[in-house]
């Protein structure tokens, strides 16, 4: 049952259109909105004093100093403005913006608009991304404070290019601005990770950058910090608010919806209270809400290539003001066939050309295709290669078990029971189970749930809302088992995953490395278990070589399968070469000037190596050789 005050408000709303038609502008179109916590209270009888909340009756009487209010306290017009001049409110008569709306008028004070240059200040009503809520379960706790920094001490780093700025050992050494430094403190970032130590000073200096570092090593902050800091230092004059076209100053492209959302969430934390607005746009979600967000203003746009092309073709986004361009997981974009779209966005739209904008390209691996694309987009760039954190021996324990297809579910059940028994307070540790098919993911999820193991799944047939819900449920521990396919989980940063189980082994050793890299992140230890049987014989040799290089114990039966699969010669997709380099790529500008043939005869690290040459040494990544002595495999610990 509604209160008398709520009834009067409803009646006023129903009668307002007719009254407005009869009397023109002589009275308020409709009564002000009554917040739920004020409903059921009697309207104050006394007239409002200066600075007090006006009564409902007083609000209905228009005046020059206090215009009529549509929407009421939603825009903080009356509540924040006070009496006298009154806080102007959007939707009232236009005199309000001059009389009280901007903070003047008889001690009114600022309403939705304030006295700062540029009008609306987003910081006044910006949602706090640091607020404790269900959505923020593990977002901050332990991401940097939980990093095993000792594992970073011996990490190899290479840079190439002229006049490389020196690395920074602490965030205090970098001039990022007070507001951003405060957000870094609130994120509990103790000190920069290796990629941040080198990449942030390079970007702050205005240089283009190609950075090769594993996912989970702090790449998002490495490109977000310089972008936010740069926008804060040299913000252009505000554009007309009436335009339906958004003019972002920075564009961050990523290959998947989930990764775009992930980057957006992190960037919002970094940009909190800086006045820098971050908006995300991706497919699979209604475009109307994204358009509304863009119309409210945007400095940093995080987008997938497909949705961005849609916005550009609708003329709802213009790239002519872009000062910063960042591509995250660039190798994945090429894998997923985005190169034509990226080239069109960067080269054929209204984006400023290279040299007039700053471009940062981040990837876990840099084979020739990525570097060729990068050289088209970058001007006088610095190449940065950051090796893996420690060795797999220290971080990820790999186990391979021979399990027939018919026995996989029972074996999985045994693993989960043992894991639960050994877990803290009998709780299930976060476990990621990879399968090959979408149907298999759904079936395994239902089977686990019916057997007492809370599980959820993520794959390409899930709606965006379902995928986001599943990830939140998994990260929070509500459903500590996530069944996933490769494509759906690629690029996601899921902290605290203790165990990765390859229920179905992939056909490619690259995908195996992507999968097990979901654990052992940020210098922490992890466990990876794989179910192997006759159908996986083509993977036996590269899997055996991988485990040997990582100083893992290789079962004798797997060595026999490896010897059988390599009988009569090797080569092909899964053939790898040994070595010791530990990077995800090598600057191809160096290789062009050295012997060895093609791009990179002289060796490479993770995914490095030769393109047409004889293949070089490689740790995870081997001597990749397109047309040469067997392909190395990318170390995309992605």
From Swiss-Prot:
Residues 79-112, 567-583, 594-632 have a biased composition (Gly residues). Keywords: ATP-binding, Helicase, Hydrolase, Nucleotide-binding, RNA-binding. Residues 411-562 form the Helicase C-terminal domain. A motif (DEAD box) lies at residues 328-331. Its EC number is 3.6.4.13. GO terms for cellular component: nucleus. GO terms for molecular function: ATP binding; ATP hydrolysis activity; mRNA binding; RNA helicase activity. Residues 119-128, 584-593 have a biased composition (Basic and acidic residues). SUPFAM superfamilies: P-loop containing nucleoside triphosphate hydrolases (SSF52540). Residues 1-129, 565-638 are annotated as: Disordered. PROSITE patterns: HELICASE_ATP_BIND_1, HELICASE_CTER, Q_MOTIF. Residues 200-384 form the Helicase ATP-binding domain. ATP binds at residues 213-220. Residues 1-21, 40-67 have a biased composition (Low complexity). It holds the Pfam family DEAD. A motif (Q motif) lies at residues 169-197. It catalyses: ATP + H2O = ADP + phosphate + H(+). SMART domains: DEXDc (SM00487), HELICc (SM00490). It is an enzyme of class 3 (hydrolase). The Q motif is unique to and characteristic of the DEAD box family of RNA helicases and controls ATP binding and hydrolysis. Belongs to the DEAD box helicase family. DDX3/DED1 subfamily. This is DEAD-box ATP-dependent RNA helicase 52B.
């Amino acid at each position: 049952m509604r209160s008398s005050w709520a009834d009067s408000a409803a009646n006023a709303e129903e009668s307002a259109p007719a009254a407005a038609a009869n009397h023109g502008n002589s009275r308020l179109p409709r009564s002000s909105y009554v917040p739920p916590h004020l409903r059921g209270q009697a309207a104050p009888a006394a007239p409002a004093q200066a600075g007090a909340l006006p009564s409902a009756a007083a609000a209905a009487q228009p005046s020059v100093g206090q215009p009529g209010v549509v929407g009421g306290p939603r825009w903080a017009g009356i509540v924040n403005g006070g009496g006298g001049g009154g806080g102007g409110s959007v939707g009232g008569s236009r005199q309000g913006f001059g009389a009280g709306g901007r903070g003047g008028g008889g001690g009114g004070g600022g309403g939705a608009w304030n006295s700062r240059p540029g009008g609306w200040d987003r910081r006044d009503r910006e949602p706090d991304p640091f607020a404790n809520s269900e959505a923020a379960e593990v977002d901050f706790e332990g991401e940097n404070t939980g990093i095993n920094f000792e594992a970073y001490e011996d990490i190899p780093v290479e840079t190439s290019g002229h006049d490389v700025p020196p690395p920074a050992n602490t965030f205090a050494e970098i001039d990022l601005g007070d507001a951003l430094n405060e957000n870094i403190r609130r994120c509990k970032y103790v000190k920069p990770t290796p990629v941040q130590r080198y990449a942030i000073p390079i970007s702050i200096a205005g240089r283009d950058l190609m950075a090769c570092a594993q996912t989970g090593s702090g790449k998002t902050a490495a490109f977000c910090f310089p972008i936010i800091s740069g926008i804060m230092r040299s913000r252009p004059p505000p554009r007309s608010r009436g335009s339906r076209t958004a003019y972002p100053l920075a564009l961050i492209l990523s290959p998947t919806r989930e990764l775009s959302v992930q980057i957006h969430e992190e960037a919002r934390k970094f940009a909190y209270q800086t006045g820098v607005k971050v908006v995300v746009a991706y497919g699979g979600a209604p475009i109307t809400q994204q358009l509304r967000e863009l119309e409210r203003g945007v400095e940093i746009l995080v987008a997938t290539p497909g949705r961005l092309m849609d916005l550009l073709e609708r003329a709802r986004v213009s790239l002519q003001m872009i000062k910063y361009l960042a591509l995250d997981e660039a190798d994945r974009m090429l894998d997923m066939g985005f190169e034509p779209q990226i080239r069109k966005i960067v080269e054929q739209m209204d984006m400023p050309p290279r040299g007039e904008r700053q471009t940062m390209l981040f990837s876990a691996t840099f084979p020739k295709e990525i570097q060729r694309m990068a050289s088209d987009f970058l001007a006088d760039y610095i190449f940065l290669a950051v090796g893996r954190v420690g060795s797999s021996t220290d971080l990820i324990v790999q186990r391979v078990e021979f399990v027939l297809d018919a026995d996989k579910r029972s074996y999985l059940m045994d693993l989960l029971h043992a894991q639960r028994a050994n877990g803290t307070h009998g709780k299930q540790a976060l476990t990621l189970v990879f399968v090959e098919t979408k149907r298999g993911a759904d079936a395994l999820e239902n089977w686990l749930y019916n057997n007492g193991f809370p599980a959820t799944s993520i794959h390409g047939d899930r709606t965006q809302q379902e995928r986001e819900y599943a990830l939140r449920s998994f990260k929070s521990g509500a459903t500590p088992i996530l069944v996933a396919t490769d494509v759906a989980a690629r690029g996601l940063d899921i902290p605290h995953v203790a165990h990765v189980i390859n229920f179905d082994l992939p056909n490619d050793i690259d995908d195996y490395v992507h999968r097990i890299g979901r654990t052992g992140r940020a210098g922490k230890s992890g466990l990876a278990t794989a179910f192997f049987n006759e159908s996986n014989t083509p993977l036996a040799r590269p899997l055996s070589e991988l485990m040997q290089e990582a100083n893992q114990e290789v079962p004798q039966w797997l060595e026999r399968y490896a010897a059988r699969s390599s009988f009569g010669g090797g080569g092909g997709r899964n053939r790898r070469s040994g070595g010791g380099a530990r990077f995800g790529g090598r600057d191809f500008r160096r290789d062009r000037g050295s012997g060895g043939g093609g791009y990179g005869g002289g060796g490479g690290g993770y995914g490095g190596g030769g393109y047409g040459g004889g293949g070089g040494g490689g740790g995870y990544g081997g001597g990749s050789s397109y047309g040469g002595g067997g392909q190395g495999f990318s170390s995309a610990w992605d």
